[in-house]
A protein has these predicted regions:
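Extracellular/periplasmic, surface-exposed regions of secreted and cell-surface proteins
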Residues: 1-13, 36-95, 106-397
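Acidic, Ser/Thr-rich peripheral helices and adjacent loops at domain boundaries
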Residues: 12-17, 21
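Intrinsic-disorder/low-complexity loop/linker signature
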Residues: 18, 29-30, 277-278
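Outer-membrane beta-barrel biogenesis signature
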Residues: 26-35, 247
């Protein structure tokens, strides 16, 4: 829980740039608002006067995790993890008539504002693992995973100009006589995942891994919510071969490895497949001879029911080298990543007839592809290892 007040950041800048003339305080010890009339400046300390500028934020935050782990059979392990996060925040702001703070655009002091937000998220993950060995030399590891998460965010804000009761700050917005406006927002997303992984090792020298994920998200349209992402890798620990026995006194590890896998990106969580609208209230009317307060709805984002997952196809070939019982370790990798169906927020052409309020509208689309490849080197050394002193180095290129 936090409860804090924010000072007007322009106080110090104004104090340095204002003319060094006049008195900050009057004879009674009060803030002298127009301390330098010739300079046309108000006192840079005006916001320090009682009820002239208030910016108070109260927040509560909670996070918790719990898990259950069972081993019903030898080699069989089940673990369930549940985590949650809750947060609430209230930010109240008041600008008095003498405030020098940068007031919210479109308003004049006195002005009272309140911003409220609340969010929660939880994630539930279950992992079932079974490790076993056949005929002494064949080791297997099988893992199954399910995961579910949900996130919800909501917010609202209120503005009231003409709140003359400075002593009541932002606690009485109903006293505002002009430009009383409200706004709110809400979003909710959910995701579900299933995963399977198989590990195989023969005598600890020949290694194989295969996995696949099935991920689904709520913010993509039907037919595009789910996709699968397979991966496979192989490894050969050459240093464990019998023909390498003569090198064991200085070569502690030599391993070749290669892998290929697909990863996915579902983009932002703002329902790219569905269109949204915004709203605005004109306190003095929308024009055309109508002076009464008016309310309009306008286009926000344009939904695309065909937008889907962005996919990256990754290839990696590498070698691990360990010398002198692990005192020197070198890893070298060559990688190549092809990313296809890039998610991009594209500006719609004016000729489409689709436009947001005051600007062209944008829509998420899958378009284009990229390629990223290169070589990566990593060197780790244990230079000095003593009982009370250790010096190590790590260099990556």
């Amino acid at each position: 829980y936090t409860d804090g007040n924010t000072r007007n950041q322009s106080v110090f800048v104004n104090a340095l740039t204002f003319l060094p003339l006049g008195d900050v305080y009057d004879a009674g010890g009060n803030i002298n608002y127009e301390y330098c009339k010739d300079g046309g400046k108000v006192n840079p300390m005006a916001d320090e006067a009682k009820d002239q500028y208030v910016n108070n934020t109260r927040s509560t935050y909670f996070t918790g995790n719990a898990y259950l782990e069972l081993t019903p059979l030898k080699g069989l392990t089940f673990k369930s993890v549940l985590g949650t996060t809750l947060s609430n925040s209230r930010n109240g702001v008041f600008f008095g008539k003498k405030s020098i703070a940068n007031i919210t655009s479109g308003y004049q002091a006195p002005l009272a504002e309140i911003y409220n937000s609340a969010s929660y998220a939880y994630r539930w993950e279950n992992v079932l693992t079974y490790n076993f060995t056949l005929a002494k030399d064949h080791s297997f590891g099988v893992t199954g995973i399910t995961s579910y998460s949900k996130n919800q965010d909501e917010a609202n804000e209120s503005h009231a100009q003409g709140q003359e009761l400075a002593g009541q700050s932002f606690h009485n917005l109903s006293a505002g006589t002009e430009k009383v406006q409200v706004a709110s927002s809400f979003s909710q997303t959910q995701s579900m995942s299933y995963a399977f992984r198989l590990n195989y090792s023969y005598k600890g020298k020949y290694l194989f891994t295969f996995s696949n994920r099935w991920d689904g998200v709520s913010h993509l349209a039907a037919g595009h919510k789910w996709d699968s992402f397979p991966a496979a890798a192989i490894g050969w620990r050459i240093s464990d071969e019998t023909f390498m026995e003569k090198t064991q006194n200085w070569l502690s590890n030599l391993k070749l490895r290669a892998g290929y896998g697909v990863t996915g990106n579902s983009g932002r969580k703002d329902a790219a497949y569905s269109s949204t609208t915004g709203s605005y209230t004109y306190p003095s009317g929308v024009g055309f001879g109508n002076s009464a307060a008016g309310h309009i709805q306008y286009g926000g984002t344009y939904g695309n029911p065909d937008v889907g997952w962005e996919k990256s196809y990754n290839t990696n070939i590498g070698i691990d080298l360990g010398l002198f019982n692990g005192r020197i370790n070198l890893a070298a990798d060559w990688y190549n990543t092809d990313t296809k169906d890039l998610l991009y927020s594209r500006t719609m052409p004016i000729t489409s007839g689709i436009a947001a309020w005051g600007s062209p509208m944008k829509a998420w689309q899958n378009l284009g592809e990229t390629n990223n490849k290169g070589i990566e080197l990593s060197l780790n050394t244990q230079n000095i290892v003593k009982k009370n002193f250790t010096w190590s180095s790590n260099i990556t290129f």
